[in-house]
């Protein structure tokens, strides 16, 4: 039989995510293309061959001492990172975290999922296009990367060979720095068979359902109603030992027991 576990914590957490898995983390290896011209057509798609591109680990850039892969001071840089998923049916949420200087556009399997400080959504900026304004990276001074909740649809992902592609842009050709440190994290309905867990750099909400009320320690009456307000069940809270449950056995029966 199936059941839903809800904590009466008063936190009001409605997420069905039970596990956070960072599939693209700081320090991962990427393939990249220096922005001396536009990259070849189709570079954002999963079937594009990037075997001739350069490779390096994130972050990418120059000038801020937050760059594991230092690139020349060009207007842009284009990066690609592949990742696999055990089961796309297990995915409930996708979150992109990104620290950047000065602008970026991010794509997941060819679909634009986020951008900041450059161009028009749906139109890829040219390699020599600058950002609207200066934007400084923050992680190298102890800050937290920007967070983007992705509107997730099941056709956005596949089990094998997903591609996160990002183009990062400077403000102008005389810019003193550039930075790009991306993270991609999946909220899962259950833990995968070989979990990695969330990045140590990031913070995520609780991974259980939490009601927006608490149960008083001295006990009180709990009432379950349906959407139209009809009472389905009533039970008085009692002291319950650790790792023990209290409820009706069998389900829907009249007897309340510890089990």
Regions found by a protein language model. Name each.
Residues 1-93, 105, 115-259:
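Intrinsically disordered, low-complexity linkers and terminal tails enriched in Ser/Thr/Pro/Gly
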Residues 107-110:
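Short strand-turn-strand beta-turns centered on an Asx-Gly dipeptide
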Residues 99-102:
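Short proline/glycine-enriched turn/loop motifs at strand-loop junctions of beta-rich domains
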């Amino acid at each position: 039989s199936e059941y839903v576990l809800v904590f009466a914590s008063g936190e009001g957490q409605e997420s069905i995510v039970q596990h956070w898995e960072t599939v693209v983390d700081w320090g991962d290896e990427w393939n990249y293309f220096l922005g001396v011209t536009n990259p070849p057509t189709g570079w954002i798609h999963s079937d594009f061959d990037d075997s001739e591109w350069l490779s390096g680990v994130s972050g990418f850039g120059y000038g801020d001492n937050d760059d594991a892969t230092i690139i020349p001071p060009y207007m842009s840089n284009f990066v690609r990172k592949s990742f696999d998923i055990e089961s796309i049916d297990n995915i409930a949420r996708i979150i992109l975290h990104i620290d950047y200087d000065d602008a970026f556009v991010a794509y997941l399997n060819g679909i634009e999922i986020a951008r900041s400080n450059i161009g028009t959504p749906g139109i890829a900026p040219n390699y020599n296009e600058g950002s609207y304004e200066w934007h400084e990276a923050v992680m190298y001074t102890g800050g937290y990367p920007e967070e983007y909740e992705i509107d997730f649809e099941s056709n956005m992902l596949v089990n094998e060979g997903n591609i996160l592609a990002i183009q990062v842009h400077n403000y102008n050709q005389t810019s003193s720095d550039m930075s790009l440190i991306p993270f991609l994290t999946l909220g899962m309905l259950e833990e995968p068979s070989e979990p990695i867990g969330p990045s140590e750099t990031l913070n995520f909400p609780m991974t259980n359902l939490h009601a927006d009320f608490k149960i008083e320690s001295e006990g009180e009456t709990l009432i379950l109603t349906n959407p139209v307000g009809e009472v389905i069940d009533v039970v008085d809270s009692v002291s319950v030992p650790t790792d023990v449950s209290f409820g009706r056995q069998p389900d829907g029966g009249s007897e309340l027991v510890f089990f």
